[in-house]
Amino acid sequence: MRENKKKPPLVSIILNCYNSGEFLKKSIKSVIFQSYKNWELIIFDNCSNDNTKSEILKFKKIKKIKYFRSKKFYSLYNARNLAIKKTRGSLISFLDADDWWSKNKLKKQVKFLEQNKEYNIVYSNLYLFNEKKNKISLFSKKKLYNGKITQLLLDDFKMPILTTMLRKKIFYKYSFDKNYNIIGDFDLFVRLSLKEKIFSIQEPLAFYRIHYSNMTTKKIDLHISELEKWFSKNNNKKKFKNYNFSNIQKIIKTLKVKKICKSGDILKFFLEVFKRPINLLNLKYILFLILPKKIIDRL
């Protein structure tokens, strides 16, 4: 009698995009050429007005690629939630339109989750691609976190969404906060880490494209606003009573100093930096005055 082999789980890949026609081809091809073949690609086009649609339609003959175009513009994390509702797989991964994966990304993460049923989330290291210098560097040179990692995420968030794979059942209970445009993955993964053990694969399995030109004052303002909202909402919650939020405050202050440096307002800079006694962090901020703006964006 022939033994029935268990069918490998279907991985639903969510690719959210908005005016991303320039980069989509590389991203989509990195999915098509995965060594793991049981996947579906859900492309959620957030009402793009460039050549995004025409680039996606070049792949229309591939039945595993499903294209959905929204009738109106949504916040990024609302769009992610809407895309999740389109999925059929038992496993979920995320890939943004300007990034891409190594060919064994899905295979290695599916294997881990199949062999370790007590885990519902796995992520990995990645490579940073500097498009201006055409240079690749490692994202984290330190060992990534494993297990119960809530405080580690609060102290140094190193869980890039494009490296993650999650069991879909997580999204029956949890979702992205649709009010965020920048920190929605941070918010979700911190909430999940309170309940879930999380495993990291140390090998880099993805490539993240750095766009320095995107670090606008408007985007910095939004980042500050969202972190302040998150801090205010969660700082006094019972579930976080044993956790330290001091690093969130440091990030907020650093973003404020960056914004002032970009504006060139020296007086405002010193008033912001020296609100508190001099420390090593304040001395670091003073370097911002010396460095070119394009370097500040990278820090």
Report each predicted region and the residues it spans:
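Conserved nucleotide-sugar donor-binding catalytic segment
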Residues: 85, 124, 143-227
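N-proximal low-complexity "stem/linker" segments adjacent to membrane-targeting elements
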Residues: 1-32
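Short aromatic/hydrophobic "clamp" motif used to bind/position activated sugar donors
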Residues: 92
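Acidic helix N-cap motif at the loop->helix transition within catalytic regions
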Residues: 22-25, 50-58, 100, 104
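Glycine-rich, basic loop-to-helix element that forms the pyrophosphate-binding segment
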Residues: 70-87
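Conserved donor NDP-sugar-binding/catalytic core segment of glycosyltransferases
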Residues: 104-137
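C-terminal subregions of glycosyltransferases and related glycan-biosynthesis enzymes
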Residues: 1-6, 187, 194, 207-299
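A conserved acidic beta->alpha catalytic loop
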Residues: 30, 45-54, 72, 96
